[in-house]
Regions:
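Short hydrophobic alpha-helical membrane-entry/anchor segments
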Residues: 53-61, 70-86
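Alpha-helix capping and helix-coil boundary motifs
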Residues: 37, 58, 86, 556-564
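Charged, low-complexity N-terminal segments of organelle-associated membrane proteins
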Residues: 1-55, 61-63, 89-90, 94-95
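Ligand-binding clefts of soluble mixed alpha/beta catalytic domains
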Residues: 91, 95-625
Length: 625
């Protein structure tokens, strides 16, 4: 037998793989006549699929039948309806073929699933494998690798991964990447919720765009509303020049949001690459800046522009490297040896900070055998002579819990020391003069360093502990001309404005204006203590005697002059510079042994923990910036 092909009718609803399907029927099948046509036609319609029943042959058969023949067929079918019903039931119970729309829906669903997987894989590729390899060759991680390294495993929830820029000038329409060069979202660090964003240098150099501003802005808004700390991992060439004013407008919006979040949630910037031009102001507005040595740079104008405009030759490291901003400009609060070190520093710093300004400073369970240092060693911190230097950090470490001190701005203005530590498990901010550098005098940079730290601690409910050993402000025309009066006033303002518990301990020198500004009783410090070695006066005994007893010393015989001077200095020291003089007038709450310092501070923090000072209503003060 030979097969005859029955062409299928062209319907749009048919699936592509069914449009050319052939159905074969035997050529020796009985041909329809007037008498057998109804039965044969009905039989064939029952035996073959609906598709064949719609074919041209079926239509030809049905349209050529006479009315009588059709009527006869109906009567015959009715007469044998039981038999025919059985045949129909058999047809209905047969497996129902999948229709074209159902197959199409399943195919589309599979395509969508594959598309999502493909898109997620594409997100991991950033600007492409070639650029990722180049990033690794520089000793740097990609944006997503950095997030994975700092957050708890599997805790990152990304927001806005598929947003793309909408610009076309200068070939941007051919350079669209999902996320537009920044990854934003939420995650956890040591179980704590945080907001995080990370610039992707593999996408257009991480250049700051309108979409980056949109994504970061949404993150800042959500984090501020939820009371979450914000970590920004920066690695960018600066503004996206091709976007023009849209990029600049994005900067402005970001700066405004940084300012609104200031004092509400902690903001930490981690510099892991370049940051140039207007982009530098965002990290400059945040609370802390961490830089990675050798790979991170910050500057408003680069070496080439400086050379063109001023003729000055300067390399990128000297201009804006980590060492420069840590030691000279004070922009960087911490410096790490590499990216991993910077991320570890950020995690450690966060452990000292509350999530927002409504939370108290963090506390942790303590074990006295582990956290308590050798308090008796404090009795040996102060050298026997007032002119001899020592490292104030040794005193801090003996007062605080073991291994808990995290110094901030360690390389900037080293004549002052600030940082966070735990004392009996509670986080506190430490401020101290450093006799090992410039005898611990206050200058412009030290004043800025101290005032800024005070204001941050006060904003986030972190108590302040001040250790005083300061002979005064640094003298000199340079300091006066650069505004030491204005800068020194910042310390007074910051301490006076602060409402957190404030405790001060005078270890040795507290002379003149430096005594007043360094958390004295007169500017409302809650607890003021002093060691027996404290010298609280307008100036030291030696200087005072030289002024007050100048005539007597001049009149003394040369061979007796030095003996007379020493006698006068000892008398002045006992009568005017002794801590008991200040204690008797109420300017010092108590004179204590050095070994008692830790216990007294812990007790003071305990009874001051619910301190609620009254403040005058005002919009804000006007700190002498």
């Amino acid at each position: 037998m030979s097969d005859t092909k029955l062409p299928s009718e062209d319907h749009e609803s048919d699936a592509n793989d069914e449009q050319n399907t052939d159905v074969s029927v035997p050529t020796d099948a009985p041909q329809p006549t007037e008498t057998n046509a109804p039965k044969q036609t009905l039989s064939r319609l029952l035996r073959f699929p609906l598709k064949w029943s719609r074919s041209s042959e079926a239509r030809a058969i049905t349209t050529t039948m006479a009315g009588a023949a059709v009527l006869a067929a109906v009567r015959a079918f009715t007469k044998n309806r039981g038999k025919n019903r059985t045949k129909l039931d058999e047809v209905q119970e047969a497996p129902v073929p999948v229709t074209a729309p159902e197959k199409t829906a399943k195919k589309q669903k599979k395509q969508l699933s594959n598309s999502l997987a493909d898109r997620r894989e594409m997100l991991e590729q950033g600007g492409g494998q070639k650029r990722i390899d180049a990033q690794h060759a520089r000793g740097k991680f990609t944006a997503r690798e950095r997030i994975a390294r700092i957050l708890d495993a599997d805790s990152f929830e990304e927001h806005g991964p598929y947003i793309e820029h909408r610009h076309s000038a200068f070939g941007l329409d051919q350079q669209r990447h999902p996320g537009d060069g920044i990854v934003t979202g939420f995650g956890r660090i040591d179980g704590r919720r945080v907001a995080i964003c990370s610039q992707d240098f593999t996408v257009l150099g991480g250049s700051f765009s309108e979409i980056q501003a949109l994504k970061i802005g949404r993150l800042l808004e959500a984090a501020t509303a939820a009371g979450l700390p914000i970590l920004t991992l920066l690695d960018s060439v600066g503004a996206r020049i091709q976007e023009g004013v849209w990029s600049l407008a994005g900067f402005g919006d970001l700066f405004w949001r940084n300012t609104q979040a200031s004092g509400v949630v902690p903001q930490i910037s981690v510099m892991l690459g370049p940051c140039a031009g207007g982009a530098v102001y965002s990290p400059g507005l945040t609370d802390f800046v961490i830089m990675a040595r050798g790979t991170s740079y910050m500057f408003i104008t680069g070496p080439d522009v400086i050379r063109t405009v001023t003729g000055e030759e300067v390399d990128i490291d000297t201009l804006g490297g980590a060492e420069t901003h840590a030691a000279r400009s004070g922009v960087a609060h911490f410096v790490a040896e590499d990216e991993d070190g910077a991320l570890v520093l950020a995690k450690r710093l966060l452990s000292y900070l509350p999530s927002n300004n409504a939370d108290d400073a963090p506390t942790s369970e303590t074990d006295e055998n582990v956290t308590s240092p050798n308090a008796d060693a404090l009795d040996k911190v102060i050298p026997p002579t007032t002119e001899e230097a020592y490292d104030i950090r040794e005193a801090i470490k003996l007062i605080a819990d073991l291994e808990s001190f995290l110094e901030v701005h360690a390389d900037f203005a080293p004549n002052a020391v600030v940082g966070f530590a735990r004392i009996d498990g509670q986080v506190a901010g430490f401020i101290a003069n450093q006799p090992a550098h410039l005898a611990g005098v206050l200058d412009i940079d030290a004043s800025d360093k101290i005032a800024r730290f005070i204001r941050f601690a006060d904003a986030f409910n972190i108590p302040l502990i001040t250790l005083v050993d300061c002979p005064g402000f640094l003298p000199g025309a340079g300091q006066e001309h650069q505004g030491i009066i204005r800068h020194g006033a910042k310390i007074v303002y910051a301490y006076s404005e602060a409402t957190v518990p404030k405790i001060s301990v005078v270890l040795r020198k507290a002379y003149g204006g430096a005594y007043i500004v360094m958390s004295s009783k007169m500017i409302r410090t809650d607890v003021c203590l002093a060691w027996p070695s404290a010298e609280i006066a307008v100036m030291g005994a030696k200087g005072a005697v030289s002024i007050l007893y100048a005539r007597q010393l001049k009149a003394a015989a040369p061979e007796e002059r030095e003996q007379k001077r020493q006698q006068l200095e000892d008398e002045f020291q006992q009568e005017f510079n002794s801590p008991f003089v200040a204690a008797s007038s109420g300017h010092i709450d108590d004179v204590i042994y050095p070994r008692e310092t830790r216990a007294r501070i812990i007790a003071a923090l305990d009874y001051l923990k619910d301190k609620q000072p009254a403040t005058l209503p005002k919009k804000h003060g006007n700190i002498p910036l």
